[in-house]
Amino acid sequence: AFDDLYHLYDDANFDVVVCNLKAEKKENPKWLKPYTILKTKYGTKIGVVGATALFDMFYDELGWKVTEPRKEIISVVKELIDQVDIILCMSHLGITEDELLAEECPEIDVIFGAHTHHLFKQGKEINGVLLTGCGKFGTYTGHLTIQYDHRTGRIMEKKEEVIENALLP
């Protein structure tokens, strides 16, 4: 079971971003990153951090360690804050944890929420952090727009909308 997860993304051509998952038996696999930094064609740097739910009993049985997600996310955000223009968090923690994270870490610009399959048709803002959620069963696709002013180094607007997939061509 340990090796199955350890080698799951060996051939992936993308980063797997999970800041609170660690291999217990050996070094973390090369594909496992606490964060990644993306750069747009306009030079905007976007830090992306991700975390999974604290299912420690499940991961322990597989030989993996999962740590307290909010603490780990906040630590990564502190590391990223001076390196990037925008910070996005991919959260598989659930709406309650996302709301607590938004209260504790206003440096995050957007939290992409999952786990509880909540639906925010136009996002939900807490403490300046935009929370998103697209429900379940692939019913909706989320569309996030961030308007960033390069002169001031500030986000001017951020908004989410969800599109009902049944209405797409």
Model-based region annotation:
Residues 1-168:
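Acidic, metal/ion-coordinating pockets
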